[in-house]
Curated annotation (Swiss-Prot):
Pfam annotation, one family: AIM3_BBC1_C
Compositionally biased residues, Acidic residues: 398-411, 544-558
Protein's cellular compartments: Cytoplasm, Cytoskeleton, Actin patch
Residues with Phosphothreonine modification: T636, T850, T894, T895
Compositional bias annotation for Basic and acidic residues: 93-110, 242-256, 284-296, 312-383, 412-423, 506-524, 597-606, 642-653, 769-778
Native organism taxonomy: Eukaryota, Fungi, Dikarya, Ascomycota, Saccharomycotina
UniProt protein name: Myosin tail region-interacting protein MTI1
Boundaries of every SH3 domain copy: 5-69
Organism: Saccharomyces cerevisiae (strain ATCC 204508 / S288c)
Gene name of the encoded protein: BBC1
Residue stretches of biased makeup (Polar residues): 77-89, 138-149, 607-641, 654-668, 832-853
Subunit structure comment from the entry: Binds to the SH3 domains of the type I myosins MYO3 and MYO5.
Length: 1157
């Protein structure tokens, strides 16, 4: 069909929508003006929408129809309508105009014709009435007659005109009468076949018989046919529409209706009947075989005793046939017994139904397989069966023994039984039986009694001794000279078994294990390989204690936990120990020398008591390794069980002796006269201790120090006795003696001349003693030398280093046990004065564990701020701001866990720092390189005496939406002197928020985000963050992005190794307007030709990739997004299945009320 010339109109037959920008989308019945024809399948056109905008694009031809064709149809139909109108109007013209000019002859001719029916009463459809050309002709004739013209183009009496008029004047509503049932003369009227179609589907009238030999018979048949009524011809359209039923339809209705299940059941029934018939044949064959076998057994029974006697006599001169006579009868008799059992079971089950027969048939085949397997196993260790079957039809079994297992045909079993029977009959003549021909050419043993149980027992015993018998039994020599022994499959397999036998005989000793078994034993768990490595390098047991914990925790969890908890209790004592306290180490060599490994255990315990790492799990690791091997029972008993518990108890006693020794040595150091030299000696070994253990002991160690506190009360009465020797070496002490008695008043009576004595009682903490020592150092005349001598004192009293610079309310949220606070409660007064310590003391004491001094800090926060001491500590504030390595180390070890880092953030306040006055981020948070939002609220309070106080709240919102609030209260005139602090932490609200709230946020903000994103498509914005720019427009309503990578509540978090199946619920929650963030991801784009392309997305860690989600296509499993690509806003898509590495998250913008702001 040729296309019309452009431009032309087309009408949409179907709605068309496409995602491509060049395509023209339209709805059904839309009129489109085609401006150009692109090719054989596409048009290019345009139309005006409801807003008056002209939209243009390409669209397929199959969706539209050319409007010109419809116009042509209307043009064709318009003459029809005009003719009908002319025809309806024309009768009125004839009635009015014809009576006067028409002559009587003409009137008679017109009246004699058929009377026309008025058009008003006859509705004539335009589609069914042909073009009435005769009507126009008659109207022209009447017009000529009325005009008076005697000339007529067409005479009225012409038959041609009458025929035309009669055709259009008849009533078209009258139906053509159907042919009535009439008697047809078959001789004169031929039968016409009205249907040219498939014969079986449509009716075909019977043909005229041509077999008539005479006219009488033909007339007779005609009379019979006259009585029959010939049915009316059938229209094919009526048959197909279903209005008339044929004979085939009647036959189909008469057939029974069956469902698919019924057909399957019928098919199964047929299969079952077929199986039953086959079973019947097998049963008949088996009965015949059993009858032959019974007759053979009954014939051989009378001769069994004589045969056995003769057999025993003939075994000595012919030893080569001994295994033959011993083992030849086993498979034969077992097969006979099996067939007897199957026969009895079959006879018992003859009355069962068909289903039981099928089950029985399956059992029968399984039993045959078992019998054949047992025969094949026996044949490997017995060479007699070979020679009995070499000469007679052994061609069927020259294959492997595996073929015997697979054969289930009863015919093969029957042949085997027949061969066995013939072998028995042939051997009977040699032992007194009737003489018969032996077709095998060799002697064959006669079976014993056909009892089944003894044979089975012997068979089991021989299976166990089979490896030894294969070596000891002599090989049978074939009798026939033409038989090659190497061609026998049994002989070949016996050789193979002999070749493999030496490797198997090595493992017969139950106490010895092969290397393969040891490998399997170690292969049962991967931890044993690690254990072996640790045994090879025992010197790394302390450093690799964490790995040992994982390796051997499943071995003895209770012992490991008990040791670990005990070492943790002694952990703080081990930190306070120094080389001058070595008396406890001599206890370990006194343990009974159980083994070399127990000595290593004790050595490990000593190292763990001295090291700050202090992990005791290496103690149990060598024990569990020895116990796992299980080869030496004595060693396992000595290491595991009671001896191991004994070593633990001894170690516990050692720890207690070390703690008591520590308290005694501390008292001796504090109360001895030459105190300075002793402390200087202690300082040297402490300097050698590496500072790395400090961060590893933060939380629970202060608890074990509680038991040592009760031992403090008996010590205070001792100082008066030792006051005389202690006073001479310290002359400048009396001037400062006024302060110490007041401080130690709760526990010690006021003794002015002996200030150093009161601090001695609490040995593990030793806080009062060291505080007073610091005061003595500050007030004494030779300040520098004394500070150097007392510098290492924190080794015996570690809680001091951080206490001096700490303000009262800084460590309010330290997670410390309550027991530590209760035991350290009596010492708050010394801490108030400790804040006045010198900066040199503080700078030299930063290695002390934070867990112990947290208790002192708890005490200090209960006191009001000591203002005078703050002005003299600019250096202390600097050192204190640097004392946050604990949090920094957590950041380094858990870089990817933002939640854990933010939960451990703690601001250590120093009033001399200016960040809280300048309203900037504190160094404790900014140094961690955490992403957060900070907002500050100031509240002014007016008080009496014209004072104006300020309550300043710092709110820090981290990426997991957990918060830290740091509140400061100070006088606006003197903030540094009057400031007090309080910090609180609030968890993330994500878990508590419901999906309903997130859906509300999606309705509020997502539509705006999508609308704004679509408006920016194809625009150039440069290197700006596209998503942050959009979110910033709702600054007063929503939470702003954190670090350009957290944009709200997390809807989806995905890593390629996790799989997509688990994300279906999360993917269903994604809505247009959500934010997609991708970090360090690699997508593998598949191409039809060439190599796959690797695309890197979000490799910039400072500013990861972010875009606006417009849709998630579940059919293609990909995100459709709007993104910033090299400064231009475009549309793109990313498939999750193409993502090979990295991390992907989907966020939803939330309101400020989501976090309580």
């Amino acid at each position: 069909m040729s296309e019309p010339e452009v431009p032309f109109k087309v009408v949409a037959q179907f709605p068309y929508k496409s995602d491509y920008e060049d395509d023209l989308n339209f709805e059904k019945d839309q009129e489109i003006i085609v401006t150009s024809v692109e090719d054989a399948e596409w048009y290019f056109g345009e139309y005006q929408d409801s807003n008056g905008d002209v939209i243009e694009g390409i669209f397929p031809k199959s969706f539209v129809a050319v409007q010109g064709s419809e116009v042509g149809k209307e043009a064709e139909s318009s003459p029809n309508t005009g003719s009908t109108e002319q025809r309806t109007i024309q009768p009125e013209v004839e009635q009015k105009d014809l009576p006067e000019p028409i002559s009587p002859e003409t009137k008679k001719e017109t009246l004699s014709g058929p009377v026309p029916v008025p058009a008003a009463t006859v509705p004539v459809p335009a589609a069914t009435v042909p073009v009435p050309a005769a009507t126009a002709v008659s109207a022209q004739v009447q017009h000529d007659s009325s005009s008076g013209n005697g000339e007529r183009k067409v005479p009225m009496d012409s038959p041609k005109l009458k025929a035309r008029l009669s055709m259009f004047n008849q009533d078209i509503t009258e139906q053509v009468p159907l042919p009535k049932s009439t008697h047809l003369d078959l001789e004169n009227i031929p039968v016409k076949k009205t249907i040219v179609a498939d014969a079986p589907k449509y009716y075909v009238p019977p043909g005229i018989p041509t077999n008539d030999t005479s006219n009488l018979e033909r007339k007779k048949s005609l009379k019979e046919n006259e009585k029959k009524i010939v049915p009316e011809p059938i229209n094919r359209a009526q048959v197909e529409s279903g209005r008339i039923e044929t004979e085939n339809d009647q036959l189909k209705k008469d057939l029974p209706q069956m469902s698919l299940k019924e057909r399957i059941a019928l098919l199964q029934e047929q299969q079952r009947l077929q199986a039953a018939r086959e079973e019947e044949l097998l049963r008949k064959k088996a009965k015949l075989e059993q009858e032959h076998e019974r007759s053979a057994v009954n014939k051989n029974e009378p001769y069994t005793e004589t045969e056995e006697a003769e057999e025993n006599e003939k075994t000595e001169p012919k030893p080569e046939f001994t295994p033959e006579t011993e083992h030849n009868e086993e498979p034969q008799m077992e097969l006979l017994a099996h067939k007897e059992i199957t026969k009895t079971s079959r006879e018992a089950d003859e009355g069962t139904n068909d289903i039981e027969k099928e089950q029985f048939l399956d059992e029968y085949t399984k039993e045959n397989q078992k019998v054949e397997e047992s025969q094949a196993d026996e044949a490997r260790g017995e060479n007699v069966a070979e020679e009995s079957e070499i000469g007679y039809g052994h061609e069927d079994r020259e294959g492997d023994n595996d073929e015997e297992k697979e054969e289930e045909d009863s015919e093969e079993n029957r042949r085997a039984a027949l061969r066995e029977r013939m072998a028995k009959l042939s051997g009977a003549s040699r032992f007194g039986a009737p003489v018969g021909f032996n077709p095998f050419g060799m002697a064959s043993g006669v079976g014993n009694k056909p009892s089944e149980e003894p044979k089975k027992k012997q068979h089991k015993e021989k299976e166990e001794e089979e490896p030894e018998q294969l070596q000891e039994l002599p090989r049978a020599i074939p009798v026939m000279p033409f038989v090659d022994p190497s061609s026998n499959p049994f002989f070949r397999k016996s050789n193979l078994s002999e070749k493999n036998q030496p490797t198997e005989t090595k493992t017969l000793d139950p106490h010895a294990t092969t290397e393969h078994e040891q490998k399997q034993e170690h292969g049962t768990h991967a931890y044993h390989n690690l254990a072996a490595v640790d045994n090879a390098h025992p010197e790394y047991s302390d450093h690799d204690s964490d790995e040992d914990t994982d390796d051997h925790e499943f071995e003895d969890a209770n012992d490991g936990l008990r040791k670990h908890s005990m070492v943790e209790q002694a952990f703080q004592i081990g930190n306070n120990e120094s080389e001058n306290v070595n008396s406890g180490e001599k206890i370990y060599p006194q343990e009974p020398p159980i083994s070399h490994r127990t000595a290593e255990v004790s050595h490990d315990i000593e190292n763990s008591s001295q090291n700050t790492t202090g992990n005791v799990l290496p103690v149990s690791s060598p024990q569990t390794r020895v116990a796992r091997n299980g080869s030496i029972n004595s060693l396992t008993k000595s290491i595991s069980g009671e001896n191991r518990r004994k070593s633990i108890n001894e170690y516990h006693d050692t720890v207690s002796t070390n703690s008591s020794a520590l308290t005694e040595t501390a008292q001796d150091i504090s109360m001895a006269a030459p105190a300075a030299p002793v402390l200087s000696k202690v300082s040297h070994p402490e300097d050698k201790v590496p500072p790395h253990p400090v961060p590893s002991a933060p939380s629970a160690p202060p608890v074990p120090s509680a038991p040592s506190v009760p031992s403090a009360p008996p010590v205070p009465p001792a100082p008066p006795a030792l006051s005389a020797p202690s006073v001479p070496p310290v002359p400048p002490v009396p001037p400062v003696s006024s302060a110490p008695p007041a401080l130690s008043a709760p526990s010690i009576p006021p003794v002015p001349p002996t200030p150093p004595a009161p601090p001695a009682p609490p040995a593990p903490l030793a806080l009062p003693k060291h505080n007073e020592v610091e005061e003595h150092v500050k007030s004494s005349a030779p300040l520098p030398p004394v500070s150097e001598e007392y510098h290492p004192m924190p080794n015996t009293a570690p809680p001091l280093p951080r206490a001096p610079p700490v303000p009262p309310a800084t460590f309010e949220f330290d997670s410390e046990p309550t027991a530590t606070h209760s035991h350290t409660a009596p010492s708050p007064p010394p801490h108030q004065n400790v804040t006045a310590s010198t900066p040199s003391m503080m700078s030299t004491q930063q290695r002390v564990p934070t867990s112990v001094l947290s208790g002192a800090e708890k005490e200090s926060r209960t006191l009001p701020p000591h203002v005078p001491s703050l002005t003299n500590r600019p250096v202390d504030s600097f050192h204190e701001s640097d004392t946050t390595p604990k949090v920094a180390s957590i950041r380094r070890s858990t870089t990817h866990d933002v939640g854990e880092i933010s939960n451990n953030v703690k601001i250590e306040f120093n009033a001399q720092e200016r960040w809280w006055i300048n309203k900037s981020a504190p160094p404790a948070i900014s140094n961690l390189k955490l992403n957060f939002l900070m907002e500050i609220d100031d509240h002014f309070i007016s008080k009496r005496l014209h004072q104006k106080w300020v309550v300043r709240d710092f709110y820090f919102l981290f990426e997991n939406y957990s918060q830290l609030r740091f509140s400061l209260t100070f006088n606006s005139t003197s903030p540094e002197k009057t400031v007090t602090t309080l910090q609180e932490r609030f968890p993330s609200p994500v878990e508590t928020q419901s999906a309903r709230i997130l859906d509300e946020y999606a309705q509020r903000f997502n539509a705006k985000v999508v609308e704004k994103s679509h408006s920016l498509i194809n625009s150039h914005i440069g290197a700006k963050n596209f998503v942050s720019q959009i979110v910033s427009e709702f600054k007063d309503e929503v939470i702003q992005p954190i670090g350009a990578r957290t944009f709200g509540a997390t809807i989806l978090s995905y890593k390629p190794e996790e799989g997509i199946e688990q994300l279906m619920k999360s993917l269903q929650k994604i809505k247009p307007g959500d934010i997609l963030v991708i970090r360090k991801a690699k997508f593998e784009a598949h191409k039809k030709i060439g190599k796959n392309e690797i695309i890197n997305v979000g490799m910039d860690s400072a500013a990861p990739y972010s875009s606006v989600v417009t849709d998630y296509d579940f059919t293609k499993n990909k995100f459709r997004v709007i993104e910033n690509h090299e400064g231009k806003i475009i549309q793109n898509s990313y498939k999750l299945s193409h993502m090979k590495s990295g991390k992907l998250k989907v966020f939803r913008i939330v309101a400020r009320g989501y976090v309580g702001w």
